[in-house]
């Protein structure tokens, strides 16, 4: 069934000067979401969205490209200063942060919000390579 040709909703420019960059760096991918102070998403990107597939998604370069993309989208909405919240053990943590600085944002604070279990579930078996 074909979609009806309706009005395409244009993205309105939000005039937000400061935001929060949530960098989620897992072992398999790196996701960057830039939100306002209340947590409403302004822009987002990930290594997979940028065309990296498989093991290339977990590289620092993929995280850098994704952070650059999310940063440029947020800059269009007027964001100039960022607080950065980094979560996860992935390799894209530092490179994503450097890419956000390269876009031209003023980074006011960097917080590590990686969840640490108080001895939660049993970890998966040890890898043997």
UniProtKB/Swiss-Prot annotation:
Looking up Pfam families in the UniProt record yields: Ribosomal_S11
Gene Ontology CC terms, in alphabetical order: ribonucleoprotein complex; ribosome
Q: Which GO terms describe its biological process?
A: translation
Keyword terms, alphabetized: Ribonucleoprotein, Ribosomal protein, RNA-binding, rRNA-binding
Give GO MF terms, alphabetically.
rRNA binding; structural constituent of ribosome
Q: Which InterPro entries match?
A: Ribosomal_uS11, Ribosomal_uS11_bac-type, Ribosomal_uS11_CS, Ribosomal_uS11_sf
Give me the disulphide-bonded residues: none
Q: What function does this protein fulfil? A: Located on the platform of the 30S subunit, it bridges several disparate RNA helices of the 16S rRNA. Forms part of the Shine-Dalgarno cleft in the 70S ribosome.
Q: How does it assemble?
A: Part of the 30S ribosomal subunit. Interacts with proteins S7 and S18. Binds to IF-3.
Family that this chain belongs to: Belongs to the universal ribosomal protein uS11 family.
What name does UniProt use for this protein? Answer: Small ribosomal subunit protein uS11
Organism source for this protein? Erythrobacter litoralis (strain HTCC2594)
């Amino acid at each position: 069934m074909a979609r009806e040709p309706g009005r395409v909703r244009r993205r309105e420019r939000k005039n937000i000067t400061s935001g929060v960059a949530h960098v989620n760096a897992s072992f398999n991918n790196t996701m960057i979401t830039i939100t306002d102070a209340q947590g409403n998403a302004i822009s987002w990107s990930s290594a997979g969205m940028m065309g990296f597939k498989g093991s290339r998604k977990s590289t620092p370069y993929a995280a850098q490209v994704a952070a650059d993309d999310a940063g440029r989208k947020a800059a269009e909405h007027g964001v100039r200063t960022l607080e950065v919240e980094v979560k996860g053990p992935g390799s894209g943590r530092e490179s994503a942060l450097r890419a956000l600085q390269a876009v031209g944002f003023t980074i006011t604070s960097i917080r590590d919000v990686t969840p640490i279990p108080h001895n939660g579930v049993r970890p998966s078996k040890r890898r043997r390579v």
